[in-house]
Swiss-Prot record:
Example of a GO cellular component annotation carried by this entry: ribonucleoprotein complex
Oligomeric and partner information: Part of the 50S ribosomal subunit. Interacts weakly with protein L23.
Molecular function as annotated in GO: rRNA binding; structural constituent of ribosome
Disulfide bonds: none
Keyword field: Ribonucleoprotein, Ribosomal protein, RNA-binding, rRNA-binding
InterPro entries, alphabetized: Ribosomal_eL39, Ribosomal_eL39_CS, Ribosomal_eL39_dom_sf
Name of the protein this chain belongs to: Large ribosomal subunit protein eL39
One Gene Ontology term from the biological process aspect of the record: translation
């Protein structure tokens, strides 16, 4: 549990941003063809390799 470098923080911020659901407007636009974000990651179960 040491200090995080700026690069590590940036990568973690990107992973946090990617870990969101598919927006509702995308589901509407694609007529529910896109329903799930298959890259969702649980903070405890899945590793980020970071």
């Amino acid at each position: 549990m040491g200090k995080k470098s700026k690069a590590t923080k940036k990568r973690l911020a990107k992973l946090d941003n990617q870990n969101s659901r598919v927006p509702a407007w995308v589901m509407l636009k694609t007529d529910r063809e896109v329903q799930r974000n298959h890259k969702r990651r649980h903070w405890r179960r899945n590793d980020t390799d970071e």
